[in-house]
């Protein structure tokens, strides 16, 4: 099994501040024990599109495509301060190349887009992400750090998602960072956080669940 994750190193920037720089790494294991790849990280600032932040570059979701290649989507913050989702491709899971900016926020839905997931379902392509600092829009997006489901078509030439429909996934204040798994019987199963960091103080620390 191949595991992909965000690795963090501290770096002194040009303005003198020390920041956590985010890169992507992989490990190989059997589902229980994993060994880090000795050439980590596999994706760094040099693999980012122009203007993308190396401080906000996290949460890879990896899958194997029908063409035999590995793909992953990663949350990113562009120069405008909002969110975007980057698409990468690899033949072997260890050497990766940038493919496209799959989707751009353009300051419509919150700021940084985290924890992306991307898959095909019933003939449409679905992008899930968890935007930070969302503002209400009608009856939608009242939970601040929330959830977003974008449904549309994937342009095979530009590898960009053509948005057709967009809505929140859950209306509670604690649902965040949802991810899906494809079950052997074809079901797409979603899991997510049960506790948002903004509301942690409202829960008893000695709860039995």
Residue ranges, per PLM feature:
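Conserved beta-strand position repeated once per blade in WD40 beta-propeller domains
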Residues: 59-61, 115-117, 177-180
